[in-house]
Every structure is written in structure tokens, then in C-alpha cells.
From Swiss-Prot:
Gene responsible for this protein: SE14
Principal localisation: nucleus
Keywords, comma-separated and alphabetical: Chromatin regulator, Dioxygenase, Flowering, Iron, Metal-binding, Nucleus, Oxidoreductase, Repeat, Transcription, Transcription regulation, Zinc, Zinc-finger
Highest taxon of source: Eukaryota
UniProt xrefs under InterPro entries: JmjC_dom, JmjN, Znf_C2H2_sf, Znf_C2H2_type
GO cellular component: chromatin; nucleus
Chain spans, region Disordered: 1-23, 86-113, 494-555, 684-718
Residue ranges of every copy of the JmjC domain listed in the record: 232-398
Domain JmjN: 30-71
Protein name: Probable lysine-specific demethylase SE14
Amino acid sequence: MPPQPPPAASASASAPDPAVPAWLRGLPRAPEYRPTESEFADPIAFLSRVEREAAAYGICKVIPPHPRPSRRFVFAHLNRSLVSSCDAPAPSPAAASDSSIPPSSSSPPPVSAAVFTTRHQELGNPRRGRPTPQVLKQVWQSGERYTLDQFESKSRAFSKTHLAGLHEPTALAVESLFWKASADRPIYIEYANDVPGSGFAAPVQLQRKKKQKRETAPMDEWEKSSGWRLSNSPWNLQAIARAPGSLTRFMPDDVPGVTSPMVYIGMLFSWFAWHVEDHDLHSLNFLHTGAPKTWYAVPGDRAVELEEVIRVHGYGGNTDRIASLAVLGEKTTLMSPEVLIDNGVPCCRLVQYPGEFVVTFPRAYHVGFSHGFNCGEAANFATPQWLKFAKEAAVRRAVMNYLPMLSHQQLLYLLAVSFISRNPRELLSGIRTSRLRDRKKEDRELLVKQEFLQDMISENELICSFLGKKSVDNVVLWEPDLLPSLTALHPCSSCSKAPEKKGEDGPRIGSTQSSSKDDSSSDGTACMTGTQSKGLSMDSKQAPEGEKLDTDDGDDLPFDLSIDSGSLTCVACGILGYPFMAILQPSRKALEEISLVDKERYKLSCEKEICSNVLPCSPNDGSSGCPLIANRSSSPVENANLSHQDVKPIRSDISLMGKEFNGTLGKHIGTSCSCSSENTIHPYGDTETPEKKIPSDCPGSELSKQSGRGDVNVPDVEGSEETISWNTGCAFARPRIFCLQHALEIEELLASKGGVHALIICHADYVKLKALAISIAEEIEFQFDYKDVALANASKSNLHLINISIDDEGYEEEGTDWTSRMGLNLKHSSKIRKETPESQEQPPLSFWGLFSKPSPISVVSNLKWLCRKARTPYKVIGYASSPDVVATPDKVKPAVTKTQIDTSGNAHENIGSEQTLQQDCVLQESNDVADMCKRPKVNDQDGHSLINIPIAVAEYPMMHQVCERPVSVSACDDPICSFDSQDSPTTVAVSAGKPTREQCGAESTELSTVKQFLDNGLIAEGGSMNFISNHEHLESDNATSVCKDEQLQVQQDQLAMVLCNNPNTELVAGELHGGAASSTLENEDSCGNTSYCSDTVLKNSEPDTDDQPETCDRSVVLVTPKSSCDQMISSSDRSCSLTLDCPVSTDAAFSSEKLSMAHDLMGSELQAVHNSKAEVVASLTDVKGAKLNSIHTTQLPHESPSSDFIISEGAQSASTTAIPRKNGTSMHTESNSIDILLGVLADESKVSSGKDEVGKASLTLMTLAGNDQSADDVTQDEVAEITDPSHGFCSSDIVSRSIGSSNRTNIICYARRKHKRKSGSEFNINSPQSLGSFVRSPCESLRPRTRPAIVEDMTNETKTAEASTANKRKKAKVEAFQCDIEFCDMTFETKAELRAHQRNICTDESCGKRFSSHKYLKRHQCVHRDERPFKCPWDGCPMTFKWLWAQTEHIRVHTGERPYKCSAPDCGQSFRYVSDYSRHRKKFNHY
């Protein structure tokens, strides 16, 4: 408890009234209503009518037609309600001897006097000692107990002190003083809130209902008084929650503050914090007597904005939204409405005087304070409009870790059927009353009935959707009374003790009267025995019409419907569901996948549970396994493993899906006569059949043993249906309860992981409710589209399953089950988000949308991080001619992938995959060109055949009009490359060198191939990454053609690219040089008798400068067998690359240099294709900053002199591929989509001589279309950045595109701004939202621009170049700066921190305190550290302390020393702590 400062000095009598701030004077006033006598007779109908207008303010005032009750009336009935508690404490001596209380009231009160406790409230901001936020006020129990007269006397004395300067204080003047005091030095006020009781007299109707005798003598004086008339009206807060038409009428239990009122006794400046009501209910507040009370409110539709303003401006903005909701729920946040108004949040004010009601509406935040001593009362109710907020309110309450109090569905159902009249004549259509009151009542009831029928239809649709799944086939009926233990089903289905009603200022304080509900019961849906449940229901036939009360209590539930705790909590959203719920448990396969990380813990847990839940079987069972439940007489409570057979035609509810495990399941683990915690499975049929055992050597048997799941038997498939085994022994696999909506989502989520076991349960009253719903639909002429669902009574095993699915009392989510592991547990997920706000992983279900964002976000803002703020400007720097292609607008059509495969007579397979969310267009060749391209399949002498692979050149994903051609790829005879070998290793064939014009016609000398090297450090699941370096000349053995040149010269410092197409091959070549650059494409028009149409040679001109080092050319073809590719696609990391070693021959000789390749770690997607038995994968590898490991080279024998050219990429070029295939088979792929993307990337160059030099960069991105390649796979691109070690610059985006002119293609160069500041969106490329069907910007797949990584130059073949990858930045070594002051050994990262430290300033960001001595600064560091150097010297005491004075005070606990004694005469009190002594002197003025 913080020390109390002395009371504020009395203001001068001549002090002027405080100036009213402009924001306060301009606040709009909430509406007020004055109902007539007839309107006042039905509060729910009246409030439902005014709610349309008043809800826009969030609050309103209702002035009753009766005068306010007298002070004597209120005090008499309030004292009576307070002393009704048997454990009412006596008033404290301190309160009785308070110097501020007059002598007449300081005498000890009688034993029977009503007393109550209070709380201390802080008002003001401390100047020091407490960091922000200062909107959170301290509230603690005072420990004092007062009678009403004592507290009134103390309050008047306090008001006289603080309002002495105001002659006649107005409401605005007091409000100005309050908000001024909230910013000044703290003062402490007392407030008695959440005191159970009422100032109303018990209504006569309630007394008759309870068969109580009226008290004639004491009540004669109150008869016909204003208080008596108001108490016997429907506005009595003791009956408002149970008023006809209120949805809270049928809440099972009496919850103080909700269904029964609570009293609030305040003094001047007693405040209540910003808050909303529990479950966002309506509240009705009545001020009995005393000073006014001011309210401020924000409408419900602006609640999210208020929460965000408080989070940012009140809590500093560093708090997670869920955590800020929890802090708001503590009801200690006091923020001026001025902050809200400045941030655009509307707010209104209202002044409540004695005898007036104040109504708050759902989701409306409100705050307020008292102008002096007063006594108020509050309770909750709900109009039909509350149903719009009920669901989200329940979820929000669960996120704040509060137990639910009610089920909105159950309350809706019971209220709707309560409107059914007992008189059958009123069910006939056409009979309408002419009374205005009755017509309004019918309108109110019509809304509830429509909501009821609509909810019935929605639940029916969910049931029908669920029954269409394979995981569930029927619905069972259950009742809470039928569970194995009546204490198993706890209130609110969470089986934990109900939370006490939280009042305006936080948790409920101890009061003089205990809660009206039993401590063993819970809140809104507390568990009730069958007798209690039936006692609350009312038989319509037994209620005579003469006993029908004025409060319409005769409209109770018909058909013996009972109010019980049949609602269960959904694990995923925290809502109490009714009447349908689903019990889910993942299948064994799904559980093993979910628990992959914690697999060992899962096994041990299962085995432990099995050992602990083994039950003996009867000796005469005659089987080693668990017998059928039909042969057992044990009770369901003692069974940990149950089986059953339901009545036909319903299938067995507990069964084992044999298909799920391919019919191979484990046998019983135990061979003795015992059963495990698993359910024993038996066949379904009219007669019992013996269980079918599975041999121990089957695969499933071993799996069963490993996973700890025994007693699993496969039923006879021919004579019985499949059954499901529920794992009831493993804590990780425990069945959990979900609402139907989230159960469907989870079922779909687990469908791909192995499936889920499901059981739908329905409350037994649903059968009656359905019959009543049909009658209501006929009455209001509502189209009731309902599909009948087969229902069956729950068996004993069903009841046992329900019982173990319900949480035990006090159950806490510790994250040990499958729901927490998958992020499906709302409480656990919110707990994790509170503990680790930086980890904001989005759960897979939809309910987190309520809390993940402060306000609804549009689609555009959702995509903000997916693209750059503005598209990078570009300019056309040249064009490439292509005489073979003529692009016309009428030949542009959307791209649809079509793959045609011809392998030795195999059937052709055409598969079309539509490209979604992209504007892809391809250009069709003209007719004459198409004729030229038609070539027969040519098989070489060695059996090689061609595979026509289409190639497209375009910028991705900016798909413009592009030109695409087929590429001839031949098969390979190398057994390593064989597609028929499923286990063949994979290597890469690389042609790297620096071609020259003289080498074009030269004879090939020798073939050099490379040996694969597998880097285990970069292996993804199911795939491998091979790094190969080739340092030999790769020359063609068969040069039969003469190159024909077509040269394109571009200006210096710019990109030079040449694009030339021939009938079967499309080549894209790009060159980048710092100096004069030129690019020459040499292509052969006439084809020889080779297996490829043309040979391509890229010539690179040397730069003018001699000191510029040579750059190496790199190119890669990646091919993988089908089996390996399957593993890659199924892998979670699909960005792995597989390679294949194939022989290479070409007409050009290339000199090779260093080759560095690395796996692209930036989340690019692997592009895969299945071609019949083979799968070809093209994946680009990152060569920038790669770590190379042990690169070796070998030579493989040259298979054929006519081997096909595979790939050749110059130092700054991109080229095409030719892949041979074995056995003379051919594979032709024709596509109208963009299947192979080639782009050349170059980053901005560092200026060395006043000019921007574009550095060496080259990229080949190839995707081979396949017959089962999905559209999404095609859209994912592989990107790499290449760094020239000789230049200090990175490559940027330079993409060559074929754009739709008739015979030329523009070459576009992107100009990057220098030193462009990186936005936060550039670092979110790996976000899960970036995957999927979102549209990416052109440079979305690029890594964030970082400083260039340095790649070491390799001088020999075996040297490994070590460099960091682009996204792993090299961290600069942090220099430590040490303090040189004597006896100080602290070090700092920066000199600024060191200088501040030497000036005796704390360097902690949240502190910044200044000290007079360095010694004090060093001692202060304990505040920010976990060091506790001082230990208690007492033997056996483990206490440690940060401060010496704390150790000294603690020692007094052991010694009993009380060194501080009061010096006032006749006091003599002694104190252990100086704070207690100081507080005592200030309180009693003992100086």
C-alpha cells in the first residue's frame, strides 16, 4: 500500500470557481427520457424502443414517473440487506474512533448494525517513482469497515475540505476539479463498490412467489410511499434481470452484479474506471440518495477506437492489444476524455441525480465519479439487440482469461419458447390484440422468435455439413444428469470455479455479505443437480391461471424444459455452445504429425497413461483382450476404456477407421487379461463376432507399440462396419470440445494430416425445442427450412467420452495437448501472446480476426507489405530483333498450360491449369513461322530423343506480351541420369567459360564434367543441394554447322542483350560490363543431323580496360528423378535444388573459371514437373555470397560424339537447355503459358569515375512445365543475385522481356535510387502471407537490399570461398567502452552511453535518472538487474534483497522488533516499518 500524503490544504473561501475547460464544456449530453406510467410498466419494451436512438451515445438517462425514495427508506432497506449475511463483520475500531467523525457517531455501533468495507483509490499522478503509464491507478483494500452513518460523516468532512472554496458547486465545476486533481499530486479516496445488497424493498410479487409472509408492522410506514411504489414496479433492480423479455431471465444461477444487484457507496471523487459490462450486457443503474454522479461514455461502435487510443496514449503503445484488453478488464484505467476527443473518439457526458436511472448499452465504455457521498445500485439485463454483440463478447472474455457466465444461444432458445402462450387459441393466426402495450410486446417477441428460428436453421446447416464428412455419421443426445459423475460437468463447461463479479474498480472485494450463490457452484451456467434443475422448471399444467403474477412469471418454460448447465465451452473460441457441440480428436496419423517435434514426450505420456489406466477384466471373459462392454457389469465411472454398440441403424460412435491406417494396425500390447486406456474395438452387427487380431509383424503393430497405443483391433470388414478408437489415456491426444463452426474448420484442417475422430453431441431438450420451433414458425409465418437429423441416445461410452472431454475444476491450459500445439486453443494462444508479444503468429482459425488488428483493415492495406510503395521507374535502352516472330493483338490470349507427352507410345496427356491472379498473356506465332517450326522428332544414333520444352522470356510477375518457343532437349544414356532409376543420385551439368568469336568454329577438344558434391548443411527435407565447379574447357566433339551472326551494339554503361529465335530453340543472352560492352549472338539457321536444331554461342567482347579482371560464366541445369522430386514437393522447405550429371557437347569451346553456387534461402518456391516417369526441375541457385564446400571435379567418358548441347551461359548471359533422354524415347511439351522465365538482374553500381557503371549480373530462371504442375507452382519464381568480386557493387533488376511489337523486343533497364531507405515491407518477404494466391510485385522475390557480400577469389580447384549470404548480414564487432571511474567496472556499447554514465545518469532507456554521486548510480543499477546481493542472515530463510534497508526491515520479521512508536498521548502504538508509522501519523494527525 503506498503511503498516503497529507490532505490537501483547504482552499480559501474567496477562491473563485475553477475555470471549466473548453473540451468539457463542449461535450454533448446523453439523451434523457421520461416514460409515462404505461411505458414505465414494461422496462424491456421501453428500453428496446429507445435503444435505437440512445445506443448512438452509449448511455442514456431515464427519469421515472415516481418521486425518488427517501433517505430513511433507502438506509432501512439497505441495512436490512447488509445484515442479512450471517458473517457480517463488526465495524473496525479505527473507523469508530476516526477523528473526523462526530462524537455522537463515534460510539461503537450495535452488533446488528450493517457494515461494509471500502477500497482506497488513487487520484493523481505521482511526480516521481513510477514510470508511465500513469493512467493506471492504484486500488487496494483499505481494511476499514464502516456503517452508512460513519462513512457519510467521513465523506462530508472530506468534501468540506476540498470544496470549501465553492459556494454552490455546479456539476461542471466539480468535474473540472476532478480532472484537475487527476493530473496533480495524488490524493487517496475511499469507495465501497461491489457490495451485495439492495436499497429497494422486496417486491410483493417476489414475496408471494417465495410464499413469504408479509411483514405488516415494519412495512406499514412505507406502504404507498414513493420508495414502496418504485420497489413494486418492474424497474426494481432485484427483478430487472428476470424481467419478461430480458435474455438474462433464464440464467441458471444468481450472479451478484448481473442477475442480482450490487450497491456502490461513494464519496467525493470516488471514481470507476473505463470498462464495459460483463459479456457486454446492458446495465441499469439507480442512484438512491446523496450527491450526483457524472458519467462519460463512448458508443459501442467506437469501442475499438477507444481501446486503441488507450493502448497507444495510455499504455505507451508497446502493449499488445490482447494484453491491453486484459489491463482494461482490471478496471484501474482512468484517462481523461480530453485525450479521446483529441484523437477523434466521440464522447458524451451525463449527470445522474438521486431518483434517476442510467442505462448503458452493449459494448459502450463508460467512466465516472461521484460529487459527494451517495448510494447507487446496479444490475444487468439484455434486450434482443444484445444478441448482435453476444458472440464476440464471449470470445473477448475468453481471451481475457475470464470464465463465461452465460450461453447466449441457450438464453435465446429458452426465452423464445417462453413466449409461447399456454392458451392454444393464441397460436392461431389472425388473432391480434388492439392494445398498444400488447402490440409492442408482440413486436419484441417477434424479433426474439425470428432470431431463434434463424439460429436453429444455422445449427441445422452445420450439422448437415458435418454429417457429410467421413469422420462423423450420427448425433447423440445427452443430459448433464446422465454423466458418470454429477460433479464432472462443471459450470460453464470449463469446470472451474466461477469468477466473482468484477465491479467498477477491479476484482470483487470482500463484503459484509457473501454471494447469494453457493460457493460450490459457479457463475452463469453453474452445475445443478437434477432436482435443482427440475425445481426451476415449471409445468404449464400445474400453474393455475390465478397464480399468474403481474411480472408475467406464468410465461415460464413449457413442456418441462429445464434450466441446467447443458452448455459446454468451445476450446477454440471460449463460447458456451448450445445445444450442439462436437468432440474431436485427431487420428493416430494426424497426432504423430502434430507431435512431430515432441514425439518422444508424446510416446512417454501415452505409455504412462496406459500403465496407469489398466483395469482388470473378468476371469470368465475368455479373451486376452478387453471384453465387450455388453459382457461387463462395471460402472462407467470405473472404466477408463469403454466400448459399446448403438441401436441400429445408427453406426457405432466409437470406431476405428481402418482405411486411415491402410488396414494395418497394431495388436494388443498386453497379453494378460487387462485393457489399456484405449477403447476396445468390437465389430458392429446383430451378433458379436470375435475380434480380428493383427499379426505382430505387420507395420501397424510396430507403430502401435512405438506410439504407446494398444488394444487396437481391426473389425471384420465383411461382417461389420468400420469403428473408431478414441485415445482416452494420452494427455496430448485428449478429446476436446468445440462448437460446430470451429469443429468444421478443424476437421478440414486435419483432413490432409490424417483425419479426425468426431462425435456430435446434442442436449436432450433439443427434441422439445425443435417441436416448439415448428409451432413458432407456423405462428409467425416463418419459412423454417429444416432438415431432419437422426438422433440417438448417448451410450455409456459416449457419456464417458463427454465426461473426460470436459475440463476439470481449476483446469489451466498449459499447452500440453494437440489443440495448443496447433494453435487452436484460445486461452493458451492468448496466454502465449501476452507472455511473448513479439511472437504474433496467427492461429489457423478465424476468431483471431477480432483481436489481431485494432480496426478492420481493407484488402489494399493487407497487401501493402506484399509490394513496394511505388513501382521502380525504368527506361528502354535498346531492342532486340526477332524476325521469326510476329506479334499481333489478335493472337494474344490468356495463358493456359497444356502439356503433351509422348514416350514410346504412351498416351498423350493434356492438362490445363489456369493461371490465377495474374495477367498472363502469350503471343502466338504467325502461321508461316508456325509452319517453319514444325519439325519431326529426330532420334540420334545413340537413342537420344528430343524433349521440346517451351521457353518464354518475360518479366515476372508483370506478365506482358511475350514470345515463347520450344527448346529441344534430349535424353541421356548415363545411368546416373536415368529417369527409370528411382534411387539414382543427382548431379548437375554445367558449362562455364568465357566464349570468344574465334572459338565459335573451333573443333571441340575434350569434355569435362563435374562430380557432384552434396552439402548436408543446406539440405532441405526430401531434397539435396549439389555444388559443382567446372574448371575445364567444355568443347563440342561434333561441329557441323557454321555460325551466322546477328550483332546488337548498345551504348557504354548500359545493358547489352540479344534475343534470337530459331525454329526449335529460343535464346536469351545478356551481357553487362563496366566498360564498353557488346554482345554477339551467333546462331545457325540450317540444322544438321544432330539431335538439336541449333547450336548457340555467346560471344563476349573484352572491355577496353586491361585492368578489369575476367569474369566467369555460369549456367546450371537441374534435373531430378521423380521420387526425389516427390520428396521435395512434399517437403516443408520446397526451395531445394536437385541436379543431374549429363554429358555435354557444343560447337563452341568455353574456358571455365570459378563457379560459386548456393541455395537460395529467401523462400523462393521450387518449380517441379512430372513427365510420365520422370520429373524435371529447374531451380535457380544463388551465387551471391555463397559458402562453397570442397568443390571437386572429375571426368566422365563422353558417351556420344553427337551429344546434345545442354546449357551455356556466358559471364553475363542467359541461355537455353537441352536435356537428353534414354532409350530413344521422346517427350514433347507444348505450352501456351509462361513456363521458363529468364531474367538478367543487375543492381546499381557504385560510382567510381563519375558515371554509374552497371556491374556484372546474370540470371537464368527456367521452369519446365509438367502435366501435374499446378498454377500456383508456375507462378513462384526462383531469383538469385550475382556479385562481381572485382567490383564493389551488387546486381539490380534488369529483366529482358519480349514485348509485343511485330519483330522486336524492348530491353528495359530499371534505375534504382541510391541509398534508398529500406521500408519495413522489404523484410517481410518470408511472411506466411506472402505465400498463397497474392499478387507479387516484380521485385517481390528479391532479397532485401543489403550491403554486398564479399566473395573470395579462388586460385585453385579445392579452395573453398567463404562468404556470408545476402540475408545474413555481417554484424560489426561491438566495441566495449569501459568506465574509468574508480571501483566502477561497467562497460557500454557506445561512447554516448559512457559519457552519460560518467555524468551520473542512468543509461537505461526507461529510466534516465540523475544522481549526485557515482556511488548512488552504481547502487541504482540493481533496479534494472536481477542481482540481489543481500541475503537474510536468519538460519533457514532463503530471502534475498536488492537493498540493505529491505534486508533490515525483513530481519524485524524474525526478531519481532517494532522500533517506531507513536509519540501522541494515549496512543502507544508501535510499528515495524516506517511507512506504517508515517501513515498512522498522517491519518490520525498524531504529530
